[in-house]
């Protein structure tokens, strides 16, 4: 993906001379053709994976989907047209095709860098303002932001590229060459490089550093929280949120109804509540919520240890319930049972924080891979842009060509970054490439910390 507006081909250089040998032409053609094929294939896999695998339809991946669309445009049109330009030594497709190619290239690339900024800001606010921001973080809002990114990119570049010659009254692009007319001055090229590359990179690196610092602070807080837990009676860790149970010898048995009312307190349910919007890249994980729209006839049974098991009379136990059993409806007619352990507020808080921390680190890992690929592939060309501003003849034309093509290689690398950092993408890619997607059998296995085993429902 060109995550910066692709710089214009310098008007001061001559593209590959017609005298290039046949072996050089063959090498360039085969290499660039393979890169184009890999770019198109990789980004098509991203789009198809998003379509067929519902696990990937998360807010994070909407931004990756937009990047893949831009990369697909680059791999399909920009790479091949630029290769033709290089191999022929001149632009032979006419002025209209030249302007359309440049407009498409710049719009897609600028939209990509804006989407990368959106990902960075999304990660930053998700980490620093998890409650207020995630409540507003919906697929519809993500789609709106992506649409605005593309619209702004189109407005900034397309009219200027297509109509500049009519504004100034003449076309000054040299015959047989293809570059943006208003970028023919080095100082203007320098300004666009600063705005389109150096400024976004600075912002993204700053945001990533803040994300890293915040994630490390979360890890330290989690370690302190887990270290503060002390063993309690019944094998669980003690917590300030525990509720006392009358369990001394000779004390009357707690009525089941009273237990159910006590344990249905909102604070206890909150310990087992997971927001569906927190479901991210890996795995389709079922959320246990306290919504009112759940189906009757099924229930959650959470078994908690008695204070003194020997003091209880087995003969008085009802055959299908006990005082230490909590019920509440579920959606699918089965039960979740946590045997031998009482839900502890601090323990469940630690589990939620652990899950959130793992998710944040995974998203930050994907962002770091994309950002690193962007910097590595785009920095060489933009350094040459700065050098050429002060010394026009200091950069050989071969370096210009390699630097420009290296920017395109970013579109080839990005799908690899998604697969490297995201197991769901990786597995889907593998199954699609092996033509085995239809044979896959999904099994929903709870993966969240604190997930409890699902068994057939029973009544209290």
Curated annotation (Swiss-Prot):
Residue intervals on the Extracellular side = 1-22, 85-95, 165-185, 391-397
Q: Which UniProt keywords apply?
A: Cell membrane, Disulfide bond, G-protein coupled receptor, Glycoprotein, Membrane, Phosphoprotein, Postsynaptic cell membrane, Receptor, Synapse, Transducer, Transmembrane, Transmembrane helix
Transmembrane ranges, per UniProt, are 23-48, 63-84, 96-121, 143-164, 186-209, 367-390, 398-420
**Record's InterPro entries?**
GPCR_Rhodpsn (IPR000276), GPCR_Rhodpsn_7TM (IPR017452), Musac_Ach_M1_rcpt (IPR002228), Musac_Ach_rcpt (IPR000995)
| Principal location class | membrane
Subcellular localization: Cell membrane; Postsynaptic cell membrane
Q: Region entry Disordered: which residue ranges?
A: 225-256, 274-296, 310-351
Q: Which residues lie on this side of the membrane: Cytoplasmic?
A: 49-62, 122-142, 210-366, 421-460
Known glycosylation sites: 2, 12
Annotated Basic residues bias: 328-343
S-S bridge residues: 98-178
Which Pfam families is this protein grouped with? 7tm_1 (PF00001)
Record-level GO cellular component terms: dendrite; plasma membrane; postsynaptic membrane; synapse
Q: Name one GO molecular function term.
A: G protein-coupled acetylcholine receptor activity
Q: Which GO terms describe its biological process?
A: adenylate cyclase-inhibiting G protein-coupled acetylcholine receptor signaling pathway; chemical synaptic transmission; cognition; entrainment of circadian clock; G protein-coupled acetylcholine receptor signaling pathway; G protein-coupled receptor signaling pathway, coupled to cyclic nucleotide second messenger; phototransduction, visible light; regulation of locomotion
The record's listing under PANTHER family reads: 5-HYDROXYTRYPTAMINE RECEPTOR (PTHR24247), MUSCARINIC ACETYLCHOLINE RECEPTOR M1 (PTHR24247:SF182)
Q: What does this protein do?
A: The muscarinic acetylcholine receptor mediates various cellular responses, including inhibition of adenylate cyclase, breakdown of phosphoinositides and modulation of potassium channels through the action of G proteins. Primary transducing effect is Pi turnover.
The family classification in the record reads: Belongs to the G-protein coupled receptor 1 family. Muscarinic acetylcholine receptor subfamily. CHRM1 sub-subfamily.
Quaternary arrangement and interactors, per the entry? Interacts with GPRASP2. Interacts with TMEM147.
Q: What is this protein called?
A: Muscarinic acetylcholine receptor M1
Source organism per UniProt: Sus scrofa (Pig)
Q: Which gene encodes it?
A: CHRM1
């Amino acid at each position: 993906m060109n995550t910066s507006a692709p710089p214009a081909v310098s008007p001061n250089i001559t593209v590959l001379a017609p005298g290039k040998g046949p072996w050089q032409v063959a090498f360039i053609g085969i290499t660039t053709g393979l890169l184009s094929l890999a770019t198109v294939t990789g980004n098509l896999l991203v789009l198809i994976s998003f379509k067929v695998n519902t696990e990937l339809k998360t807010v994070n991946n909407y931004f990756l989907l937009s990047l893949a669309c831009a990369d697909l445009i680059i791999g399909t049109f920009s790479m091949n047209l630029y290769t033709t330009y290089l191999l022929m030594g001149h632009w032979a497709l006419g002025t209209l095709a030249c302007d359309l190619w440049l407009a498409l290239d710049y719009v897609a690339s600028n939209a990509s860098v804006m989407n990368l900024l959106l990902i960075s800001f999304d990660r930053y606010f998700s980490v620093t303002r998890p409650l207020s921001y995630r409540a507003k973080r919906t697929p519809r809002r993500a789609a709106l932001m992506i649409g605005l990114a593309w619209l702004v990119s189109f407005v900034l570049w397309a009219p200027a590229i297509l109509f500049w010659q009519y504004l100034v009254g003449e076309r000054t692009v040299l015959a047989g060459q293809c570059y943006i007319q208003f970028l023919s001055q080095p100082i203007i090229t320098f300004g666009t490089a600063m705005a389109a590359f150096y400024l976004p990179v600075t912002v993204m690196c700053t945001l990533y550093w803040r994300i890293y610092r915040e994630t490390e602070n979360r890890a330290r807080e989690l370690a302190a929280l887990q270290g503060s837990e002390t063993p309690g009676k019944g094998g669980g860790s003690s917590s300030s949120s525990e509720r006392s149970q009358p369990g001394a010898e000779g004390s009357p048995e707690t009525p089941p109804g009273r237990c159910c009312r006590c344990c249905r307190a909102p604070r206890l349910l909150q310990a087992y509540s997971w927001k569906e919007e927190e479901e991210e890249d890996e795995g389709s994980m079922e959320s246990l919520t306290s919504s009112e729209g759940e189906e009757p006839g099924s229930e959650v049974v959470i078994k908690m240890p008695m204070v003194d098991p020997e003091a209880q009379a087995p003969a008085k136990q009802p055959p299908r319930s006990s005082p230490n059993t909590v019920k509440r409806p579920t959606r699918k007619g089965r039960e979740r049972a946590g045997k031998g352990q009482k839900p502890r507020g601090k323990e469940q808080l630690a589990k939620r924080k652990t899950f959130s921390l793992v998710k944040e680190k995974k998203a930050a890992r994907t962002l770091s891979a994309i950002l690193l690929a962007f910097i590595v592939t785009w920095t060489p060309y933009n350094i040459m842009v700065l050098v050429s501003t002060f010394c026009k003849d200091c950069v050989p034309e071969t370096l210009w060509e390699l630097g420009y093509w290296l920017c395109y290689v970013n579109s080839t690398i990005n799908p690899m970054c998604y697969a490297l950092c995201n197991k769901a993408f990786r597995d889907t890619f593998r199954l699609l490439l092996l033509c085995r997607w239809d044979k896959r059998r999904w099994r929903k296995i709870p993966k969240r910390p604190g997930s409890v085993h699902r068994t057939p429902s029973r009544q209290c």
